A protein has these predicted regions:
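S-adenosyl-L-methionine-dependent methyltransferase catalytic core, i.e., the SAM/SAH-binding region
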Residues: 1-330
């Protein structure tokens, strides 16, 4: 999630200083901004050291079109790549790159998407019930398809699983009752349905928040994409290369935490209460660095959306990637 646009042209992503410190950019190195968005990480990496090269990946064509001036400014050093970061290995190998020195991920939905009602991500402004990261992909289901077509039990499962919503069954029941009268097409319609059946929390969080999060994650397969992206990073990073991942809610962070715990050899040990199937020991492919970091109070004051951000970082060892072995064995 990137910071909202301001009156200045510079696009500043969440925890920029901390991400740069984790990646430790060096002259002549190759980096990947895996969630390019407004290009904040990419720009900072290009400015941080001479002769750095950055590949900016984004599945949203609109983001890459908007980045044309930045690409001209850093001609020969910034390469824009259209696609999903879960496909990073193929995308970069296709561009002639087989190893990189650092990869940054800024997970979740970008402020550019949230602030545009026509993209259908926000419950604060009415718009089409879309939520696709790539609005040009006609093969991908929209949020409207999910709320109008999923059986009630499956819809409740999605809202509970991806929104961590305790009242998922009640919400699904209300949605099914509403769609029986007329198909749901607008974010405003859905938000009002949820608000009618979910009490407002004491902390002031909108009752529709968790349902919208759940549908967005479901529509874009965000958790699966994160798993694929981290596995791709393991394959692409050179020994000593750095990985920096900023997540914004517990589901994202759990995927990142689990991956790094496994790959660094810090997974929970088996016990008689929680046995873990025996498997051949593997050499750790990452070394954790810096511990978990959170935004400073100063950053939160200027950008409240940064508050839930969590940064996890790791350094690649010289061990063969587990992901590559798994892919060959499949």
């Amino acid at each position: 999630m990137t910071a909202p646009r301001s009156s200045t042209p510079r696009h500043v992503p969440v925890m920029l200083a901390e991400v740069l410190a984790a990646l430790a950019p060096k002259a002549g190195a190759i980096y990947v901004d895996a969630t390019f968005g407004g290009g904040g990480y990419a720009t900072a990496l290009l400015e941080a050291a001479p002769r750095t090269a950055v590949f900016g990946i984004d599945r949203d064509p609109e983001a890459l079109v908007a980045a044309a001036p930045l690409a001209r400014r850093f001609a020969g050093r910034l390469t824009l790549v259209a696609g999903r970061f879960g496909d990073m290995v193929g995308l970069l190998v296709g561009a002639g790159v087989r190893g990189v020195d650092g990869i940054a991920f800024d997970l979740g939905v970008s402020s550019m998407h949230l602030d545009d009602p026509e993209r259908g991500f926000s419950f604060r402004a009415d718009g089409p019930l879309d939520m696709r990261m790539d609005a040009t992909d006609s093969t991908q289901a929209r949020a409207a398809d999910a709320v109008n077509r999923l059986p009630e039990a499956e819809l409740a499962r999605v809202i509970r699983r991806f929104g961590e919503e305790k009242l998922a069954a009640r919400i699904a029941r209300a949605i099914v009752a509403a769609r029986a009268r007329a198909p749901l097409k607008r974010t405003g319609e859905l938000a009002e349905i949820v608000r009618r059946v979910v009490p407002r929390a004491r902390d002031g969080i909108d009752p529709a928040t968790r349902t919208f999060q759940a549908l967005r994650i479901y529509v874009n397969d965000e958790l699966g994409e994160i798993e694929r992206g981290l596995a791709a990073a393991e394959i692409l990073l050179k020994a000593g290369g750095r990985l920096a991942v900023v997540s914004f809610h517990s589901l994202e962070d759990r995927v990142v935490k689990t991956f790094l715990a496994e790959r660094s050899g810090r997974s929970p040990l088996p016990s008689r209460h929680r046995p873990i199937p025996q498997a051949p020991a593997r050499t750790p492919t990452f070394r954790l660095i810096a511990g978990i970091r959170r935004p400073s109070e100063a950053e939160i004051a200027t950008n409240p959306r940064a508050r839930p951000g969590r940064l996890r970082a790791a350094e690649r060892t010289d061990a063969p990637p587990w992901s590559d072995a798994e892919r060959r064995a499949a």
